[in-house]
Amino acid sequence: MKLFHLSDLHIGKIVNGYEMWEDQRYVFDQILAYVREEQPDAVMIAGDIYDKAVPSAKAVTEFDEFLTELADSGTIILIISGNHDSAERLDFASSIMKKQNIYMKGTYGGEAMKVTMQDKWGDVNFCLMPFVKPANVKNTLSDLTEEPEKESAALTYTEAMQQAVAAMQVDPGKRNVLIAHQNVTNSGVNRRSDSETISIGGLDNIDRTVFDIFDYVALGHLHSPQQIGKPEIRYCGTPVIYSMSEADDQKSVTVVELGEKGKLSIRELPLHQLHAWYNFTGTLDEAMSREANEDYARIVLTDKETIIDVQARLRTVYKNLMSVEFQMADGSRPEQERTLEDVKNLAPDEAFADFYNRKMKRELSDENAVYIRQLIRDYYEQRQG
């Protein structure tokens, strides 16, 4: 059985003021071409369909067109919600969609959605587990423990997922595939991207051994492709580059071919980007020596003297200039006020860190930077309702 593993489409995303519609469509067209060529039995999309919980009308239309073209290929489509999605909105019309072989699981009501497919080796059971927090699991599973005094105790993410997996009643004698959108870790720290939502102190970490009962775990949430402890537990990464930290990633579609129980192979189909992502550090003269281009560019200038109209000059070469920063030879930044245009190019957490540095004359600690990101995330989540 051949499966395509995708995640983190983030339809409607805006990066440093640049709308990514054309970049997304360019990549989606490649995915559709691969589907027609490879004819997978199922396409799995592991969460973060949209970039916002309340997507724009255009974002909904873009996803509708992509989903329609996927469905026209005849493949079965399996979709879950991610932390960026509105679970309830993603559930809309899911019953009707099942009749078109599109299975969407947005909300968690105490059990994962189960879809069973067959091939020459028998059944393959898919468990669709949308993004959850421990409170979601605790509030929907009434039989967490037989000890009443412990029922009010808070669950860690690992404990919550253990309970959720136990509720799935997975048959270990059959082939089982989990689709999930969580932060799953092995020993150490996963490779993360600047475009991801970050939690404080790894509170959302889930130990990968929770999923050992599955033959393959199709994960979404982390934006760089990577396996977690073993090849069968995998993040496919975003199909589109969304930050400079992903500039060197080879984006791809993960292809999983299931054989008989215990046998599978994994390969990747490359996805090319509409724009290159260019990170440059050097003098203005060096930066201006390139030919005019449409790369998404981050320029860090090391010039010692003050430069007038630097952004206007750089934009004559870099049409899609995302940010300009200044750095002294020793790696520090010169003490100068930012222009309004400079501030507009900063993410909210970067703007706060810059403000803190200028007022307090010291860098914001890593711990406090993570805390500020979480506060900003909570603020936007509350606004999005």
Model-derived regions, located:
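Conserved beta-sheet core of the metallophosphoesterase superfamily
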Residues: 184-264
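Binuclear metal-dependent phosphoesterase catalytic core
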Residues: 112-120, 124, 129, 233-296
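N-terminal active-site segment of His-dependent metallophosphoesterases
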Residues: 1-68, 72, 373-378, 382-383
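Active-site neighborhood of divalent metal-dependent phosphoester/pyrophosphate hydrolases
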Residues: 8-12, 40-58, 75-88, 184-202
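Active-site neighborhood of phospho(di)ester-bond hydrolases with catalytic His/Asp-centered motifs
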Residues: 6-7, 43-48, 76-83, 103-108, ...
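Conserved catalytic scaffold of divalent metal-dependent phosphoesterases
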Residues: 92, 96, 100-199
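Accessory, non-catalytic peripheral segments of nucleic-acid enzymes
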Residues: 37, 42, 258-385
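Metal-dependent catalytic neighborhoods of phosphoester/phosphodiester hydrolases
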Residues: 14-17, 47-66, 81-101, 106, ...
